[in-house]
Amino acid sequence: MITGEEINQCITDNYPELIDKIYPIFTTVVNDLSVVYSITTVSGGYVGQDILQLRIFDSDYDVATEWKRKLINLFSTEKENKAIVLPTVSFTGALSGGGDNFRDDLQIWEITAIFVLKTKERV
């Protein structure tokens, strides 16, 4: 099972410009880029599976879709056939879905990417 802290660490280690722009479940920041994550555990144990949903919010569609591309490249590991190794967990990931939505109430784009992560606890 992967935690939000590990997702945050993985993203900020690779993209330090996202430090303080990553939030669990929701964000109240609508005047700047923000990335919101949610994790659903499908199966647990020593080897498990999680669904990671990333939502990128920005008023500029091109900026949001560029960040989506970067995060897809980070979490879709099947192309290189390698795992991402963190101190307490390692995982492989595959893009499972996503989409684009314009939030008319906030005048901001919400770009979503959904990943299936196969996790293994590190002892």
Language-model features and meaning:
Residues S34-V35, L52, A113:
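A broad, low-specificity signal marking well-ordered, structured residues that form hydrophobic/aromatic
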Residues D50-I56:
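Short, well-ordered beta-strand segments in beta-rich or mixed alpha/beta enzyme
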Residues I56-D62:
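A generic structural motif
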Residues M1-Y46, D62, E78-V89:
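Small/polar-rich, solvent-exposed N-terminal microdomains that initiate assembly or binding
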Residues I11, W67-N73:
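Short amphipathic alpha-helices in soluble, non-transmembrane regions
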